[in-house]
Structure formats: structure tokens, C-alpha cells
Curated annotation (Swiss-Prot):
Membrane topology, from the record: Multi-pass membrane protein
Known EC number: 1.17.99.9
Primary localization class, coarse: membrane
GO terms under biological process: heme A biosynthetic process
Name the record gives this protein: Heme A synthase
GO cellular component entries: plasma membrane
Cofactor needs: heme b
Binding positions (heme): H272, H332
Keyword Transmembrane (UniProt): yes
Gene of this entry: ctaA
HAMAP family recorded: HemeA_synth_type2
Purpose: Catalyzes the conversion of heme O to heme A by two successive hydroxylations of the methyl group at C8. The first hydroxylation forms heme I, the second hydroxylation results in an unstable dihydroxymethyl group, which spontaneously dehydrates, resulting in the formyl group of heme A.
Residue ranges of the TM segments: 21-41, 106-126, 139-159, 171-191, 212-232, 268-288, 304-324, 326-346
Summary of subunit composition and partner proteins: Interacts with CtaB.
Amino acid sequence: MTTMSRSFGRSDLANGAHRDVAVWLLACCFMVAVMVLLGGLTRLTHSGLSMVEWEPIRGIIPPLNDTDWQLFFEKYKQTPEYIKVNAGMSLAEFKGIFWLEYIHRVWGRLIGVVFGLPFLWLALSGRIGRAMVPRLAGVFLLGAAQGGMGWFMVKSGLVDNPAVSHYRLTAHLALAFLIHGWMFWLALDILADHRSTRRRAHGDVGAVRSWMLGLTGLVIVTLLFGGLVAGLKAGLIYNTWPLMDGAIVPKDLFPEGFHSLFEDIKTVQFGHRTLAEITIVVALVGWFRTRARLGTQTPAAIHAVGLMALLQVGLGIGTLVMVVPVWLASAHQMGAMALLTLCLWALHDLGRRI
């Protein structure tokens, strides 16, 4: 059992509440995954700058009549995106981009309610112990920060250049993955404590867990570079694989030194591609070696990670060579979340076998 798992203790969840709390956390994980999907669709359909104000309470109410719609549309007409990109857009076209951004924002508020109210009830009713309260409170605070980060990102696209900061977009994405991953890990801890068992396996489990820890780190860095690629629209160029600009290592990388790794479109795409290629090699080699070491005792989570890594690299290559179709790019983004989630599952499971 992992150190984090042990820290909860059987007293942290009273009266048989283990499974209920775990199911609630997993439901919140699912809602965050849907939120990430909606956010990706909002970005890919260029809908994210259609709402130019952030009103956490009043913003729940959408335009209800023609007057309301005209008011929202007139505000949008003052933005750089309308002036430089969408000049002449009709009200009907504006409604098309508005609704997706609106749903994205309201879904975020709904997550806050679905997480916050049960958390208060669980804490006040004593159904969770003191050790868990600060952990769940931390998740709630991260969720609140995520709302602010979302608006901080949108604001960057409402001044001069009609595109959000790729740094802020990546931070917004990273926070979503952090919230999702933290809740998932807590749910696994609760379920492991409920079962109250430790499974013994082959002595090589420690080495396998070290490999999985390294792979998880690679997945995280790769998905962060994926956020930079998305923010810079770097997937719209050099749409070939395995060659990039006619070479394995293209010319003119790092034109401005180290900063190019985060700001030059060509270098950023190369970084993401290279990290993805390293990740799939590490995943497959580790998967095969684990099967050789542990045989039939290989955890199901390890097999799931290997298969998902294969699928994810296929989704990434397809997204690139097909020049970022919305449906495939969305699948690739969700594949990243699925792969990270499976890595966390594998890490947790391996920790209980040591």
C-alpha cells in the first residue's frame, strides 16, 4: 500500500461510507473529463472568445430574447477576434459559437456544485475523517482557481491579438488534469482502504513501479507540450510523419535559443513529436519487460497502459497527417487524459503490491 494510501486509515471513513465517497469522486472525475472535452471543442471551433465577460453568478443566465442576444453580440463586435477575423459575422453565426462556450462555462459551475455541496455534507456529518477534509478542500480550491485561470486565459485573447496565450491555455489544461488526477487517486485510496488488502507479487514489482513512475512523468511532460502545440496551432504545419519538413531532425530548430522550445512553432511541434515517440518506446519496452518479469501476475492496469499508449500515438499521428480535424483532435486530447489516468491506476496498484 502506498504512503498516501496508509495516511487515510480506516477511521477516515465511517459507517461504511467508503464506496459512496469513492463513487462520488469518480463521478466528479467523469465530469472533469467532459469539461476537458468541451474545452477542447471550444478551442477547435474557435468559440472560446465569444463571451467577453466573466460573471460567476449572473453568467449562468443565457440570452433569453432578441434584445439580450443583440447586447451580447454588440459586446463581441468590440473584440479583436470580430474585428480582425469575423467581421461581418451574422447573429445566427454568433449564436453558433456562443452556445458552446456558454455550455463549457456552466458545466464548470455545475462541477463546483456537484463537488462542493456533497463535500460540505460529508465533512459536517462526520462521514469522512479529519485527515481527508484538507485533501478534499484542496481539490475544491483548485477547482475555484481553475475558474479564474479560465478567465485569465480568455482575457489574453481580448486584447490586440485575437488568440489566447498558449502559456495560459497550457496552464488551464494542466490544472484540469491535476484536479482529475488528484480526485482519481483519492478514490483509489478509498477503495483500497475499503478492501483493506495488500497483494504480494514478484520481487521485481519495485523496478516495475519505478518504470511506471518515469513513464507517468513522460506522459505529463508530453501532454504539456501538447497544450503548447494547441495554443500555437502548431499542428497545422508539417503534417507528415515520421519525417518533419523532409527530415527526422528538421533544420532551423531553436532559432532564438532555449526560448524557442516554448515559443517557436516548429520547435514546439518537434518537441511534442519527439516526446511522444520517446514515450511510446518507453511504454512498450516496459510493458514487454514487465510481462516477462511478472508473467500472469502482471496487473491489468499495466496492460491497459500499454494498449492505450499504442492507441494514443495512433490518434496523434492521425491528427497531424489529417491536419487537425475536430473529432480526431478531440479524441487525441481525451486519449491523453485516459493514458494519464491509467498510469495513475497502475502506479497505485503497484504500490499496493510492494
